[in-house]
Amino acid sequence: MASLLAKDAYLQSLAKKICSHSAPEQQARTRAGKTQGSETAGPPKKKRKKTQKKFRKREEKAAEHKAKSLGEKSPAASGARRPEAAKEEAAWASSSAGNPADGLATEPESVFALDVLRQRLHEKIQEARGQGSAKELSPAALEKRRRRKQERDRKKRKRKELRAKEKARKAEEATEAQEVVEATPEGACTEPREPPGLIFNKVEVSEDEPASKAQRRKEKRQRVKGNLTPLTGRNYRQLLERLQARQSRLDELRGQDEGKAQELEAKMKWTNLLYKAEGVKIRDDERLLQEALKRKEKRRAQRQRRWEKRTAGVVEKMQQRQDRRRQNLRRKKAARAERRLLRARKKGRILPQDLERAGLV
């Protein structure tokens, strides 16, 4: 910003110098015209006041002072612009010297020069607000700009390559899909799809809609083999009751018909074996069920005892806090009564307690 101010001050001072150079020549021409006319014409006219010249001198002094103050801050910028300013000054001097007879046109030319210089100054300011010219940048800044440009070009090329690859892949997929559609016969689409099977390296998922609750219940009943629900789960009491009910039914059937009882028992064993082959854990051992039930009841009793102990501890702690609170309240009440009696004794009152202690009552 200091360099811009220095340029502005220098251009303004240059324009004022050009105007001041043209002013003496104009005055000399007017003096010559007046002397020639005075010889031929009548009495001399009054001289005009040189207010314009004084105003220009004042402006020149202010501009020089401003240029000095800014030149101390940025001497390099002002020095860099000196050759161009010298050329412009020489051009304006030659133009003013080439037309000595045209005295009336010097003032508009100076105004035009100021406009041109001001326009150039605005162009420089706009250039500095932007990226700036490459001549004024340091080598490090130029190298940084070059690297940034290379990086932008590289990213642009990479994006273009990715777009081209994506486009080629989509076109290839479209052609493959078209070939598959053309290769499949029309009757193949109407055939019902077989239920998906389990392959160890591949799992096929059917596109059927999820079954409702009633459908799932029906499928579960169909999965029950031989109308025999498997004895699974961790509700040992229920499992033991079911197992005992089966044994009682077998005993009743054995009392009626031994052959049917043996057939039913064999059917139950085969059904349990089929369930076990599928990975279902069958709990059909009465001894193990009783032991598991005892362990479960024991753990439940232990949890119940721990809970009761914890509850009793909580109640005991609450009672202790209540007793401590009541004791503190009684102590505070006794202390307040003692303080009241002490204040009464200080005032000279004779209390019944004092009479009892003295044995006067």
Swiss-Prot record:
Modified-residue entries (Phosphothreonine), positions: 229
The keyword Aminoacyl-tRNA synthetase is annotated on this UniProt entry: no
GO biological process terms held by the UniProt record: ribosomal large subunit biogenesis; ribosomal small subunit biogenesis
Compositional bias segments (type: Polar residues): 23-39
Location of region: Disordered: 20-106, 125-230, 299-334
Residues recorded as bearing Phosphoserine in the entry: 74, 138
Motif (Nuclear localization signal): 45-49, 154-158
A molecular function GO annotation: DNA binding
Name the UniProt record assigns to this protein: Surfeit locus protein 6
